[in-house]
Amino acid sequence: MFDQKQKSLALEFARSLSKRDYRQAYNMLNLNAQSQWTEDGLREQFESMIPLDWGDIDPIQLEENPAWDEMFLYVVLGGDSYSEAIIVNSFASDDEIPKIDSFQFGRP
């Protein structure tokens, strides 16, 4: 089960990406995830999912479901025509600060 700090971090990560603040989003990743991603990589993947002409990304919210709550956090990124998502699979701590260790873009 994910705790409230982890849920808040997943939401803040999605909000940072939605604001196109890739540096802030990158800094929410732990060292392992940072070794696999760059700020430009985050931008490219996010903008291939949600292009610049998408419009407002609203709502940004956790969708909870007992079937998957033990496995991952599902953050909905709402749009006018359809929604997308960010799935956060795991967290780790760097110097006792919770960070995102593994995530993926897009709906399953």
Short names for language-model regions:
Residues 8, 12, 23-66:
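Short solvent-exposed beta->alpha transition segments
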Residues 1-15, 19:
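Short, low-complexity N-terminal intrinsically disordered segments enriched in polar/charged residues
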Residues 17, 26, 30, 76-78, ...:
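Generic alpha-helical secondary structure signal
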Residues 3, 14, 47, 92, ...:
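Compositionally biased, low-structure terminal segments
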Residues 54, 59-108:
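Exposed beta-sheet edge and beta->alpha loop/turn motif
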